[in-house]
């Protein structure tokens, strides 16, 4: 069984998103079948600008392979986040080309990561599981109140 886990953050990156993604992968390893193979696609650690964390671009350990996509340094403004996600999206699409999974899992505080995972699942005829950590409907009003320029 092959599973793709798509997460913008993954250890050694810091924060709740990285920890949650790692918990999902750990649970899958513990409870999954003996033929389980998990492909994690994430970014290089980039959550906090003041903390430099090293991570290899590619790791392969036991049943898990991790591909980390390098993104340019960015701030946390909306424009920078959109730019980072667009670059992440293009890199993910290139990386998953001609690959197949039984299940695609996305853990995301961004609806765009979930939509990217849904696109991959449809394209590969895989089952999709979404773990959305942010209630978009609760936060959209706060986002729209901020000035963009």
Model-derived regions, located:
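A short helix->loop->beta-strand "cap" motif at the edges of active sites that frequently abuts
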Residues: 35, 124-127
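N-terminal subdomain of nucleotide-sugar transferases
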Residues: 1-65
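A cross-domain feature marking catalytic cores of carbohydrate-active enzymes
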Residues: 42, 108, 132
């Amino acid at each position: 069984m092959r599973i793709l886990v798509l997460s913008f953050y993954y250890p050694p990156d810091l924060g709740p998103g990285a920890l949650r993604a790692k918990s999902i992968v750990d649970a899958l390893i513990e409870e999954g079948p003996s033929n389980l193979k998990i492909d994690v696609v994430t970014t290089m650690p980039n959550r906090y600008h003041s903390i430099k964390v090293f991570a290899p671009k590619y790791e392969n350990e036991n049943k898990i392979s991790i591909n980390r996509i390098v993104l340019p340094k960015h701030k946390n403004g909306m424009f920078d986040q959109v730019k980072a996600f667009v670059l992440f999206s293009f890199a993910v699409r290139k990386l998953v080309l001609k690959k197949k999974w039984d299940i695609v899992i996305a853990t995301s505080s961004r609806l765009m990561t979930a939509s990217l995972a849904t696109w991959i699942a449809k394209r590969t005829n895989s089952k999709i599981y979404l773990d959305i950590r942010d209630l978009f409907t609760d936060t959209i009003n706060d986002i729209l109140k901020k000035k963009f320029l």
